[in-house]
């Protein structure tokens, strides 16, 4: 073996022992006649002391991130020289042998201390970035997440199954990544956006309880904090209700939070209906760590003469202390609203009397009653949105979050809880597609709520889904549903969606065929594993918990991907081949 001990494991009990270590030079200090090295490996750091002699000569020429093998004796540090910041701070290794295993070129950025370099450079040298404590810690936390999830699944007698990465293209809302099939020129595989159809087939197969840590791929425009390839903990169960799936999901989440965040979640988690979440928070993934709930003022302004409030819906949200904002700060709110598609953002400032651009246009009764109607106090600001209900609620939801950011309402120092998790249940089954028809809010195999099972086609806009999302601190971390297993219900859903029988067979024929053979009632959930890891690691971006992530533009600075292919590769892959000419048949349904 190259080493006998790991650097970060040495303790006072090891004093007097001879050890052989291997690792990297995190820090070097030459005090003339004696050289101190901080030697780092995956377990931690220990101080190495090299005095005159061969070891000292070698130590005097090493530099940051040289890879070394060190042999010597563990000794207690002299009294007063202990380092409480290191777990090994009570001991040091007095080296009598130092071997340079490999040298390191000058670093593009330091791997100790703060890093002032752009993200693209960090990703280009990701292998160096991962030597830093934070990124390395995040990957180890993620590994623990995987272990704990598997323990929970095993306890509930689930079977871990790997589903295909090379499959056929099926519509799931985003574009597929396509892979040419060389042996069938002109034909293409698709990388799966999720294992949705395969896990339902496993339920038809009688497996009953399935899970996997599934890699998923979506070729979508990059926005917010997305990656083209991501991981989810994917779960499917037979003979279950919504409550059954949610109880299992809570076991997974409670285990993760207990073991990795030291937080015991109170179960069962609170549940809000989709309608309630939108009404109170303007979001289907509300952050419940703070208040500032939306106030519905539609009835309050029912007889108003103010034209902007003569709308189907009027709502407001209060900013504590907002009346003290400068004019430029108040103008920023208009810019904020316009960036979200609104014309602006009306407001009043609460003091001895109401002030602001619209205050003078309110009636005496409206001015007198508005503070009580909204719960605003002197010194607060009240922001309004009016118009179509959902759009107005979403704008106020965004304003609410911005208020929290500016007022630091989610800061534990302000009294906010560190964590707030909840379920959002009973979402719409369908939503308008913008062309006079309907589209599935989730996917076309989502079951209606039992009370809507026989009448969803009559009022698609009111029908509710047997679906559920789990939210943590305003982040959706998982979602699922009960699936349709009855052929007649599935056919009626397709009819609402405007999907003909021929189109359904072309897109989902293999699944519909399987459903002819006694499919069980089933449902499931998928957790956004990257997002959960980011939350538990306390980092802002999921890129910080992925070993080799892509940039916001979808590129990989480390490998240079994506890259062009050669003409020879293009020809060999059959990218330009006509599949119908090759098969000797006219255009139509392609073989699966």
Swiss-Prot record:
For the ligand (L-aspartate), the binding residues are 172, 218, 442, 483
EC number assigned by the record = 6.1.1.23
User: InterPro entries under this entry?
Assistant: Aa-tRNA-synt_II (IPR004364), aa-tRNA-synth_II (IPR006195), aa-tRNA-synth_II/BPL/LPL (IPR045864), Asp-tRNA-ligase_1 (IPR004524), Asp-tRNA-ligase_1_N (IPR047089), Asp/Asn-tRNA-synth_IIb (IPR002312), AspRS_core (IPR047090), GAD-like_sf (IPR004115)
Keyword Coiled coil listed: no
Highest taxon of the lineage: Bacteria
One GO BP: aspartyl-tRNA aminoacylation
Tell me what reaction this enzyme catalyses: tRNA(Asx) + L-aspartate + ATP = L-aspartyl-tRNA(Asx) + AMP + diphosphate
Physiological role: Aspartyl-tRNA synthetase with relaxed tRNA specificity since it is able to aspartylate not only its cognate tRNA(Asp) but also tRNA(Asn). Reaction proceeds in two steps: L-aspartate is first activated by ATP to form Asp-AMP and then transferred to the acceptor end of tRNA(Asp/Asn).
Matches recorded under NCBIfam families = aspS_bact, PRK00476.1
- Quaternary structure (record): Homodimer.
Report what the protein is called: Aspartate--tRNA(Asp/Asn) ligase
Q: Which organism is this protein's natural source?
A: Acidothermus cellulolyticus (strain ATCC 43068 / DSM 8971 / 11B)
């Amino acid at each position: 073996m190259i080493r006998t001990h790991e650097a970060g494991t040495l303790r006072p009990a090891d004093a007097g022992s001879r050890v052989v270590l291997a690792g990297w030079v995190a820090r070097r200090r030459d005090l003339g006649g004696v050289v101190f090295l901080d030697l780092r490996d995956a377990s931690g750091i220990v101080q190495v002391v090299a005095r005159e002699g061969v070891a000292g000569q070698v130590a005097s020429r090493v530099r940051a991130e040289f890879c070394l093998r060190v042999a010597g004796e563990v000794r207690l540090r002299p009294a007063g020289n202990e380092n409480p910041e290191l777990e090994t701070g009570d001991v040091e290794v007095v080296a009598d042998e130092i071997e340079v295993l490999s040298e390191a070129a000058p670093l593009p950025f330091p791997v100790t201390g703060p890093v002032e370099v752009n993200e693209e450079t960090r990703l280009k040298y990701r292998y160096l970035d991962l030597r830093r404590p934070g990124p390395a810690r995040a990957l180890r936390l993620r590994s623990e997440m995987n272990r704990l999830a598997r323990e929970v699944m095993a306890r509930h007698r689930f079977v871990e199954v790997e589903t295909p990465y090379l499959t056929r293209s099926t519509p799931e809302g985003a574009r597929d990544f396509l892979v040419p099939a060389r042996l069938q020129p002109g034909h293409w595989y698709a990388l799966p956006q999720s294992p949705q159809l395969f896990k339902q087939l496993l339920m038809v197969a009688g497996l009953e309880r399935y899970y996997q840590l599934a890699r998923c791929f979506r070729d979508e425009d990059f926005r917010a904090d997305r990656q083209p390839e991501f991981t989810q903990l994917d779960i499917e169960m037979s003979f279950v209700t919504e409550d059954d799936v949610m109880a299992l999901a809570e076991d997974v989440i409670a285990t993760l939070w207990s073991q990795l965040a030291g937080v015991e979640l109170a179960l069962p988690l609170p549940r809000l209906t989709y309608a309630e979440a939108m009404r109170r928070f303007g979001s289907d993934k509300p952050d419940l760590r703070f208040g500032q709930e939306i106030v519905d003022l539609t009835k309050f302004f029912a007889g108003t003469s103010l034209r902007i409030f003569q709308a189907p819906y009027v709502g407001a949200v209060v900013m504590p202390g907002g009346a003290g904002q400068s004019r430029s700060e108040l103008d920023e709110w208009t810019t904020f609203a316009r960036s979200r598609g609104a014309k602006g953002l009306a407001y009043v400032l609460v003091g001895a009397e109401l002030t602001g651009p619209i205050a003078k246009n309110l009636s005496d009764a409206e001015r007198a009653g508005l503070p009580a109607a909204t719960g605003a106090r002197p010194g607060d600001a009240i922001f309004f949105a009016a118009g179509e209900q959902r759009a107005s609620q979403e704008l106020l939801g965004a304003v609410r979050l911005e208020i929290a950011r500016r007022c630091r309402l989610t800061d534990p120092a302000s009294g906010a809880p560190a964590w707030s998790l909840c379920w959002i249940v009973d979402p719409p089954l369908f939503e308008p597609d913008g062309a006079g028809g309907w589209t599935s809010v989730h996917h076309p195999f989502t079951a209606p709520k039992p009370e809507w099972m026989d009448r969803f086609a009559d009022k698609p806009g009111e029908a509710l889904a047997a679906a559920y999302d789990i939210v943590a601190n305003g982040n959706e971390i998982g979602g699922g549903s009960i699936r349709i297993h009855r052929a007649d219900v599935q056919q009626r859903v397709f009819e609402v969606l405007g999907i003909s029988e021929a189109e359904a067979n072309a897109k989902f024929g293999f699944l519909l065929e399987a459903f002819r053979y006694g499919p069980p009632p089933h449902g499931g959930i998928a957790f956004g594993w990257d997002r959960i890891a980011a939350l538990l690691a306390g980092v802002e971006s999921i890129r910080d918990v992925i070993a080799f992530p892509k940039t916001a533009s979808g590129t990989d600075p480390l490998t240079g991907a994506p890259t062009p292919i050669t003409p020879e590769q293009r020809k060999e892959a059959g990218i330009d081949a006509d599949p119908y000419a090759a098969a000797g048949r006219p255009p139509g349904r392609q073989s699966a």
